[in-house]
Amino acid sequence: VPPATVQALADLHAAGLHVVPITGRPVGWSVPFASAWAVDAIVAENGSVALVQGGVQSQIGRQPSPDGRFVLSKLYQQDTATRQANHARMQQVAQRIVREVPGATASTDSVGRETDIAIDHSEFAHLPPAQIAEVVRIMQSEGMNATVSSIHINGWYGSHHKLDGARWI
């Protein structure tokens, strides 16, 4: 993330605004940024999970713990049982995509994902439009939502999306 962007977030926060970046990146990728940046929360994985400063679900804000460190809480749009079932299904879909679509690979940040899967199409790999469309078709045929970002094809179960995540938190 460019330093000018991080500074802009800090300036907004210093001006008294609630700052909540929204990303398609995984929650695992977001943890160091949520801890270091002057933000109230980060919504990750296309709106399904939030890292909230302060450790209290109903409160947004950077609130230190008694020892002075900032505490992060993970909040999810889906309950634990639903997330676990969806995660298992999504891993099967990801394996199918890698098997059936030539050149398809899981994104390098897949390890930190809890509520979606991501197939790389332009970050480190290059998939032509026909193969991107095939990945989307497979995800949708498995009942998943699918979206194509500038670098990944993301798939997930549930009705959430980035705008929904912004409104939720």
Question: How does the language model describe each region?
Answer:
Residues 3-109:
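Active-site phosphate-binding/coordination module
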Residues 92-169:
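Conserved acidic, metal-coordinating active-site core of Asp-based
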